């Protein structure tokens, strides 16, 4: 690992000569405050801390090796250059515990930030990955010269804590071989805490779960060019309070589950197919998106409750490929107590009617128009997940289980009720 404090006088002089404006938000230099700048690249092989009173710059791909713990203080700002990214290997840990008033922010080091400016953040654990020998799978999205094999048999594996964290302008998928998206969790175990995380303006997939048993809570995905919340290869965790907003970027889906015909779950090779349990999810699409708001395919299973699927100009729900359709017919893949409010709510396949399946009265789902979503309109770029007075989604929910993870008091459909305090104070929505 290379850690080198930069000379602030040189940095500030260069910024001034370049005529760059807005440096307070881009370079972590607050008005009246000069923070030391620390450049980081390569391997971290021992316990290391990144401090809030400095600006950390990822000049290359940073790898936390097995046995080491990377601690990031609340309020720390991490800037990434084009080749920058962070990988936490199996047996390593990250303790990134921000707070509502002092979130940890990973963002672009560019003066004019844009989606895809840098690679992203990867947690690689030792929990099972479906269809892989021994539950282990080499990662296929790493830059040249960097290797990692994720997965294993430790379902309760602990990769650390990722709490009150924003990841912005990541997911580079051009010019460089392989992109992890914004935030990728591969083979991450249930001992890992992922709570209050925003992934914003991503060039590829925003949040990607590959295998593992990790559970996630208070997740906000805003603006992305591929899939918002993606799972495959045997993810069997839980999730609650998940908001996915395509915004003004032309993406594909809000949720994509399964890997299509390449999915190990499709041919019976895998012994632990994807089977998440989700409550309180809001998916907000856009008029010109490429796919349905929810695309369920491959051999995925899963149970989803209290979902608000809204405003896609294409469709709300598509269940593709025979194995996923078979799982749906057998009750292994299910959506209940949910609302679909899109221009066209269902994609019916030749041998499977998503509309008949979803609107079976036993499922207690509702088929509404896009104008009946109960969500306020976007104003000045702000993103609202709270429900308007009288919204259909304020009734008809089923209580989540009281199991120590879920909040059973969330008696509304979607990620938020009439107010949305859990996504306020630590989130941000910069265009550049």
Region spans (language model):
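Bacterial N-terminal signal peptides that target proteins for export
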Residues: 1-12
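C-terminal motif of bacterial Sec signal peptides marking the signal peptidase cleavage site
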Residues: 19-22
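Extracellular beta-rich repeat passengers
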Residues: 27-71, 83-93, 97-99, 103-204, ...
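Post-signal peptide N-terminal segment of secreted/secretory-pathway proteins
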Residues: 77-79
């Amino acid at each position: 690992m290379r850690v080198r404090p930069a000379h602030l006088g040189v940095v500030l002089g260069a910024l001034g000569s370049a005529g760059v404006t807005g440096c307070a938000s881009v370079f972590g230099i607050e008005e009246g405050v000069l923070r030391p700048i620390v450049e980081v690249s390569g391997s971290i092989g021992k316990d290391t801390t990144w401090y809030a009173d400095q600006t950390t710059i990822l000049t290359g791909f940073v790898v936390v090796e097995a046995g080491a713990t990377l601690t990031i203080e609340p309020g720390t700002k991490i800037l990434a250059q084009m080749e920058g990214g962070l990988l936490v290997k199996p047996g390593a840990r990250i303790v990134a515990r921000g707070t509502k008033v002092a979130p940890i922010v990973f963002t672009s080091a560019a003066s004019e930030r844009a989606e895809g400016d840098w690679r992203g953040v990867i947690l690689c654990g030792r929990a099972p990955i479906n269809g892989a020998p021994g539950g282990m799978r080499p990662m296929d999205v790493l830059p040249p010269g960097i290797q990692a094999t994720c997965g294993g048999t430790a379902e309760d594996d602990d990769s650390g804590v990722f709490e009150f964290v924003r990841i912005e302008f990541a997911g580079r998928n051009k010019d460089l071989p392989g992109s992890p998206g914004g935030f990728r969790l591969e083979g991450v175990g249930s001992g890992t805490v992922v709570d209050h995380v925003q992934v914003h303006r991503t060039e590829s997939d925003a949040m990607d779960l590959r295998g593992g048993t990790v559970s996630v809570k208070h997740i906000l995905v805003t603006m992305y060019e591929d899939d918002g919340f993606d799972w495959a290869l045997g993810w069997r965790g839980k999730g609650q309070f998940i908001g996915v907003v395509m915004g003004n970027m032309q993406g594909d889906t809000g949720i994509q589950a399964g890997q299509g015909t390449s999915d190990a779950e499709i041919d019976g090779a895998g012994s632990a197919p994807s089977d998440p349990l989700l409550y309180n999810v809001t998916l907000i699409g856009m008029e010109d998106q490429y796919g349905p708001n929810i695309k369920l395919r491959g051999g995925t299973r899963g149970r989803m409750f209290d979902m608000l699927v809204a405003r896609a100009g294409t469709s709300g729900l598509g269940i593709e490929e025979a194995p996923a359709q078979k799982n749906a017919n057998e009750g292994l893949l299910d959506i209940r107590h949910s609302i679909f409010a899109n221009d066209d709510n269902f994609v019916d396949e030749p041998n499977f009617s998503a509309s008949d399946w979803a609107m079976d009265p036993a499922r207690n789902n509702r088929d509404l128009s896009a104008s009946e979503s109960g969500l306020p309109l976007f104003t000045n770029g702000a993103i609202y997940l709270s429900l308007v007075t009288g919204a259909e989604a304020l009734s008809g929910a089923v209580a989540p289980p009281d199991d120590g993870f879920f909040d059973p008091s969330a008696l509304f459909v979607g990620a938020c009720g009439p107010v949305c305090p859990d996504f306020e104070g630590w989130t941000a929505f910069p265009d550049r």
